[in-house]
From Swiss-Prot:
Region listing for Disordered, in residue ranges: 46-106, 876-920
Name of the molecule in the record: Envelope glycoprotein B
Signal sequence region: 1-39
Feature: compositional bias, Basic residues: 85-98, 876-888
Glycosylation sites (chain numbering): 98, 119, 152, 409, 441, 683, 733
Gene: gB
TM spans (from-to): 784-804
Region listing for Hydrophobic membrane proximal region, in residue ranges: 728-781, 740-781
């Protein structure tokens, strides 16, 4: 904001500025009046600047100057005033008049400078009159093309099938028994697991049908083959029995199970000894099984493979299916009533149950025929609106709802050529009937039956053609008008004969079909649009040709220039047009005159302004007349009667010049003149918006199910197996002996080093005693141990009886007991003599004894007794020490003394009992 002092100064200067402006305007008005006065007297002066400004000479053809109403424009800013050649002043009134004219000329020169073109590209052209050396004619009208229309379009309903990559799923039942053998070692204060053996054995067929399915029970023993040996395992090392199956603790969405025991049998051993225990757990488990084409095997949710077709059976067709096992491992049970092991109820309807034994388990499943259980193709899309178009030897099925186009041959593809495809006709017919009843029942009629086409990418298109009711009635009326039988509705070629059977191989992506749809959509739209444009363009050109022929008679130059494409001059020579080439003139070499009046003819004026130009910068100045569109005519014969109120705009360079009353007024820019368009708008329909939505051939779940193994389910089942069939919370406590020993150890440990030493000795003895007693009691508590002890006792009693009998015989008759053979011989001789009645030889009938031999026998017996006594004494001396040796020495001395003192005797004397004791 300006300060107050500045405002006061501006208020004082403003009246002075207004006064100066008014004086300048008055002076200009006086000068203009003088100039008009000179022009009224018929003076036509020619003004020329210095030689270096000769190109800016102004030729005023005696026309009147602009009046005050128009007012010549002032000097254009940025253009310097050109110096004028000073004239010799005249004295008096004449001198003042010349001064006024000089000012008027200066203003006119400034105005003319403003008229000059500012754009260097706005060229002027000089077109000489054609001589007829070159003539042209217009072309005759052309025939216009027709817009191509589609042919043989058919509407209908379609059902699209794809390859079935999902496996065949069914429920299978696993029967097996888990055998666990544990070995433990019992310490003084702890129990250590030293061995663990796990195995699985299949359940026999008879036990499945007669025990598990009939009673809901399972036996606790199992006999199976391992390493070519038949072995038997008993649960808890007890005789086998039937145990109830109980539901598992947890389950998965695809499986459930039952078991007989959840506790591991690990018996306590005696301190310092090993003990083994066996656990047999009968498990029945329902799992999901999967089999993929060609259905030669299936895999269980546990990860186990079974190499037999799920459709294998004993029937004629089922027996041809694949089976990798021997015949004795497979059994098919007709009339099998499955039992629900949870509720115990039996199914009301019988099934055919397949049973197969593997080395680890027995698998059972319900047999079903292969057809219609599986189908090699599956329904993908139901299309309510499907357009079929014929393109040469192919059909294109287009669906706007799918934004896809499927290309097929014109010949049909019978579904019988696809293996396991009986479901196609059944599912397609049901889908078509449902769509027709819901949407087309009142408006359309079916044409023939279902048609089958194999599309690119491995898709089977089942198509039902339709026609509207009105079109069907038209066909009937046409047939009646011709008095003919009703013509059959349009049909397609019959399907080819069925060849070798195979399966479809469908691509995972349908992008090619969507691209085909996009291309066909764009092609159809663009071709129709271009066809309409071409036809309309041709018709427009033929219609405009008439206008061109008429317009060339009025302005041949403009018509010829527009037709040839460059500036030419032209004139009509009868029915042809002569042309000549125009010469370009630079804008700075063209000068416009300020008046359009003829000095010699006051009532006649020029119809267009006069100009002066040069072909080159230093060339000679040539007079001409401004034509249309910056054309310079060499003749100045375009005249017209002068009229009052004359106003004209003429193209000059890149703008317009405005003449009023046949005198230059001012310059007008092209932008200041409103434009009226002569173009005809072409109304074209642009492409409609199409959103590409994701279209999946196979969903993520289908791709996941395409594999036989569901690894997530396998891992889930394996990790939950222990939770389902084992008790991991129950703990078996140690024996009381271990608790007693642990308490004693803690007691002695609290007494210090001495107590620990004493405790070790006491604990060792106590543990030994407890172990012996526990071993004996455990051995006796065992049935086998008790039987063995009984047998040992019986054997001991028998041995004692025979020993006692022998001792009694030895005491009664030692010689007979010690020498039974000798006594047997004497008794035999005596019996023989008694039987014969002959007396024995010798006096008195008794055989005489040899006294010498008897004495030798007595001596031998005596010394044998002495030797035995001496051996006993020596043996006792080794144990008793010195006293025993002294006693033995004294005994020897006594014996020797007795032997030397006793005289030899021939009679037999037995050794007395006291003597034998003394020797000992």
């Amino acid at each position: 904001m300006a300060p107050p002092a500045a405002k006061s100064r501006a208020s004082r200067v403003a009246p002075l500025t207004s006064l100066v402006s008014m004086l300048a305007a008055a002076a200009a008005a006086v000068a203009l009046c003088a100039a008009f006065a000179e022009a009224a007297r018929g003076v036509t002066p020619v003004y020329s600047d210095d030689a270096d400004e000769s190109s800016e000479s102004i030729i005023t053809g005696g026309a009147e100057l602009p009046g005050e109403d128009a007012g010549p424009p002032g000097p254009e800013p940025g253009l310097p005033d050109r110096p004028t050649k000073p004239r010799k002043p005249r004295p008096g009134r004449r001198q003042r008049a010349n001064k006024t004219r000089e000012d008027a000329r200066a203003q006119l020169r400034e105005s003319v400078r403003q008229i000059r073109a500012e754009n260097a590209t706005s060229m002027f052209y000089v077109c000489p009159p054609p001589t007829g050396a070159t003539v042209v004619q217009f072309e005759e009208p052309r025939p216009c093309p027709d817009v191509a229309a589609g042919k043989n379009f058919t509407e209908g309903i379609a059902v699209i099938f794809k390859e079935n990559i999902a496996p065949y799923k069914f429920t299978a039942t696993m029967y097996y028994k888990e055998i666990t053998v544990t070995q433990t070692w019992q310490g003084s204060r702890y129990l250590q697991l030293t061995g663990l053996y796990n195995d699985r054995a299949p359940v026999p067929f008879e036990e499945i049908t007669d025990v598990i399915n009939a009673k809901g029970l399972c036996r606790s023993d199992v006999t199976y083959v391992r390493s070519q040996r038949r072995v038997t395992a008993y649960d808890r090392d007890e005789w086998g029995r039937e145990v109830k199956l109980v539901p598992s603790k947890t389950s998965t969405p695809n499986s459930r199970g039952w078991y007989t025991t959840d506790r591991m049998y690990a018996p306590n051993a005696h301190a310092g000894f090993y003990k083994a225990g066996t656990t047999v757990n009968c498990i029945v488990e329902e799992v999901e099984a999967r089999s993929a084409y060609p259905y030669s095997n299936f895999v269980l949710a546990t990860g186990d493979f079974v190499y037999v077709s799920p459709f294998y059976g004993l029937g004629e067709d089922a027996h041809r299916e694949y089976n990798a096992y021997s015949a004795d491992r497979f059994k098919q049970v007709d009339g099998f009533f499955p039992r629900d092991l949870d509720s115990g109820e039996t199914a009301p309807e019988p099934v055919v149950r397949n049973l197969l034994t593997t080395p680890k388990f027995t698998i059972g499943w319900d047999w079903k025929p292969k057809d219609p259980s599986v189908c090699s193709v599956t329904k993908w899309q139901e299309v309510e609106e499907m357009m079929r178009a014929e393109y040469g030897s192919t059909f294109r099925f287009t669906s706007s709802s799918l934004s896809a186009t499927f290309t097929t041959n014109v010949t049909q593809y019978p579904p019988q050529r696809i293996e396991l495809s009986d479901c196609v006709a059944r599912e397609a017919q049901a889908a078509v009937d449902a769509i027709y009843a819901r949407r087309y029942n009142a408006s359309h009629v079916k044409v023939g039956g279902l048609q089958y086409y194999l599309a690119q990418g491995g898709f089977l298109v089942v198509y039902q053609p339709l026609i509207s009711n009105s079109l069907a009635e038209m066909y009937l009326r046409e047939a009646e008008a011709r008095a003919l039988e009703p013509a059959p509705l349009p049909t397609t070629p019959a399907p080819e004969a069925a060849g070798s059977r195979g399966t479809l191989s469908t691509t995972q992506s349908v992008e090619f079909a969507r691209l085909q749809f996009t291309y066909d959509h764009i092609q159809k739209h663009v071709n129709e649009m271009l066809g309409r444009i071409a036809a309309a363009w041709c018709q427009l050109q033929n219609q405009e040709l008439v206008l061109w022929n008429e317009a060339r008679k009025l302005n041949p130059n403009a018509i010829a220039s527009a037709t040839v494409g460059r500036r030419v001059g032209a004139r009509m020579l009868g029915d042809v047009m002569a042309v000549s080439t125009c010469i370009a003139v630079a804008p700075h070499n063209v000068i416009m005159q300020n008046s359009m009046r003829l000095p010699a003819r006051p009532k006649t004026c020029y119809a267009r302004p006069l100009v002066s130009f040069r072909y080159a910068d230093e060339g000679e100045l040539i007079e001409g007349q401004l034509g249309e569109d910056n054309e310079i005519r060499l003749e100045q014969n375009n005249l017209e009667p002068c009229t009052v109120g004359h106003k004209r705009y003429f193209v000059f360079g890149d703008g317009y010049v405005y003449f009023e009353e046949y005198a230059y007024s001012h310059q007008v820019s092209r932008a200041d003149v409103p434009v009226v368009s002569t173009f005809v708008d072409l109304n074209l329909t642009m492409l409609e918006d199409h959103e590409f939505l994701p279209l999946e051939v196979y969903t993520r779940q289908e791709i996941k199910d395409s594999g036989l193994l569901d690894y997530a389910e396998v891992q889930r089942r394996n990790q939950m197996h222990a939770l389902r069939f084992s008790d991991i919370d129950h703990i078996i406590n140690d024996t009381t002996n271990a608790a007693l020993m642990d308490g004693l150890f803690r007691f002695f440990d609290g007494l210090g080093a001495a107590g620990q030493a004493i405790g070790k000795a006491v604990l060792g003895v106590t543990e030994a005693v407890i172990s012996v007693v526990s071993g004996v009691s455990s051995f006796l508590s065992n049935p086998f141990g008790a039987l063995a002890v009984g047998l040992l006792v019986l054997a001991g009693l028998t041995a004692a009886f025979f020993a006692l009998r022998y001792i009694m015989r030895l005491r009664a008759n030692p010689m007979r007991a010690l020498y039974p053979i000798t006594t047997h011989g004497i008794k035999a001789e005596a019996k023989a003599s008694l039987a014969s009645g002959e007396p024995r030889s010798g006096p008195g009938g008794i055989e005489d004894f040899d006294e010498a031999k008897l004495e030798e026998a007595r001596t031998m017996i005596k010394y044998m007794t002495l030797v035995s006594a001496m051996e006993r004494t020596a043996h006792k001396a080794k144990k008793r020490g010195t006293s025993a040796r002294i006693s033995r020495h004294l005994t020897d001395m006594v014996l020797r003394k007795r032997n030397t003192a006793r005289p030899p005797s021939s009679e037999y004397q037995p050794i007395l009992e006291d003597e034998d004791d003394a020797a000992v």
